[in-house]
Each structure stands twice: as C-alpha cells, then as structure tokens.
Amino acid sequence: MPIRIPEQLPAQNVLLGENIFTMDMDRAANQDIRPLEVGILNLMPNKIETEVQLLRLLSNTPLQINVDLIRIDNQAPKNTPQSHMDAFYHDFSSVVNKKYDGLIVTGAPLALIDYEEVKYWETMTTILEWAQRHVNSTLYLCWAAHAAMYHFYGITRELRDEKFSGVFKHKVNDPNNELLRGFDPSFYAPHSRYGHIDTSLYNSVDGLNVVAESDEVGAYIVASEDKRMVFVTGHPEYDPDTLKDEYLRDIAAGQTPPIPKNYFEGDDPATSPIVQWRSHGSLLFTNWLNYYVYQTTPYDLSQLAEKSQPKR
C-alpha cells in the first residue's frame, strides 16, 4: 500500500531505502480514488523510530493511505527534536472534527504509573471517547490496549515484579477471524511490559474475543466482534534491535532487567537478536487495514456511525 506522507519526513528516506513504496502529496492527488484516512496517536518518546516502524507496516497492501501523526500534548519529547514535532505533528485539537477510517494508538513507557496519575490521562480519555464517534476501527498497542480496557470496561491490569520481555510463542484461538488470515497456528511476537490482564477478564466482556494468546504471557490479540476495536498487548511493530536497546538502556540506568527471552542466541546479549516475528507482525497490520478498516468503512466518512458504548 503506498502511504502518503509529508515530504521531508525523516521516515521517508528510511522506507525508500527498504524498497517500501511511499507517495508524495502531488502524486497522490492525481490518483482518482479515495485514500484511507489513518491517524497515529504517537505516545512513544522516540517519535521518529516509532513512525518508521508503523509506516513500514502500513505499506504492504495496494490502497493509498493518508497518515496524520497526532500528538497528545504540547510538551517537548525528550528524544525527538521540537522542529520535527512542529513540522509533522497535529495537535489533537486540530483534528478533533475530522473522521478517520483507522486510528493507531501506540504504547507508552508508563507501566508503573497509575492511569489517573498520567499527566495527560484526561486528554487520553477524551480521545478514547472521541474515537468511538470519529474512527471506524482503532488499533491499541501495549500500554494503550490496557488503558483502553480500563477506561471502557473498568478492567484493571496487575503489575508484575518482573517485566515480560522477549519474543514469545503464541497460538491462534480463532483461525476464522480475519485478523489472523494467513497466520500459522503458532507464531512469535515481542512483548515488553510489566502490566498484565488475565485472559479470563477479556473473556468476561461481551463482544470481545481473545483471538490469539500465549501460554507464557497471556492474551495477545483481542478483537471486538464489530471490528471497531483491536487490542494488541505486545509490540509487533518492533525493529530487530528494539528489545536489545531497551535492555541495554535499563542496565545503563542501574536496573537489573531480565534478559529478553527467545531473543539472543544462548541468552547471550553479545550475540545478534533472533528475529522471528516480522512476517506475522506485517500480516496483522495488513489484515487490520483490509478487513477491519477498508472492508467496513463508509466511502463517505461523514456517514460513519457512532459506535455503541462499551458495556462496563
């Protein structure tokens, strides 16, 4: 899928170097089709790295996508130049009246903070409610998945003493679910989180299905029956070195993190990571775009129906 992004966005050169098709605004304007409108609410500290990871995964099907990068507040991120934020990001207030075919809400390094103590929690809940009226299908990743479960269903995560870190084996629970079309019966995916919600709690919610899970780390992909919400508790978007970088960062900060499981050869951090999740990660995003976004969204987004309120 050619993704339509602003000229000069740093991710463009990275993606072109990987032979991933991007399209500038002028060329896109000459295609006589309606592109999908997808927003990315980027909560990660390193905005540029996350942009590359997600744009890479959005690029693999044959439809055009307009991508809006959205910020949740005006505080300057520690790991991204302010000039980048000013050039490429929309404040939520500037898109509040817009409707989207799809929205991705990223994870955030807030695992050990109570939701109500998060500085932008009030804005976060406003956006969660806004998405019910303005977005056809929303994909929540890691922290955002747990935060949305808490807001919509009152389900509280537990915080583990030791972080889930590594690449874990998962199984397909519902092979007929379109999100998992083309998946192997078992597959691997990265996780990096302290928070955990027991699978039984997801199953207790009417209209939600745990379509893929792990014996080690629990529910991985949870989907609403109406396709309007998808909760992914891991990080299918991660680059090969992301878990390694997080591990080394925590060590440098004086912590004693666990060595990421199933990631280094012989559990030796001096070796190169074993990458065994990228094909399924790409397939998950492709299936979401095709079956949960493109196949269900109205051609005229002004006709987008308000989602019924989740039952708490």
UniProtKB/Swiss-Prot annotation:
Gene name per UniProt: metAS
Subcellular locations according to the entry: Cytoplasm
Single GO BP term: L-methionine biosynthetic process from homoserine via O-succinyl-L-homoserine and cystathionine
Record-listed substrate binding positions: K163, S192, R249
Family to which this protein belongs: Belongs to the MetA family.
Organism taxonomic ancestry: Bacteria, Pseudomonadati, Pseudomonadota, Gammaproteobacteria, Alteromonadales
A Gene Ontology term for the protein's cellular component: cytoplasm
Organism: Alteromonas mediterranea (strain DSM 17117 / CIP 110805 / LMG 28347 / Deep ecotype)
Active site: C142, H235, E237
EC numbers: 2.3.1.46
Keywords: Acyltransferase, Amino-acid biosynthesis, Cytoplasm, Methionine biosynthesis, Transferase
SUPFAM superfamilies: Class I glutamine amidotransferase-like (SSF52317)
Residues marked Important for substrate specificity (site): S192
Domain of life the protein comes from: Bacteria
Protein name: Homoserine O-succinyltransferase
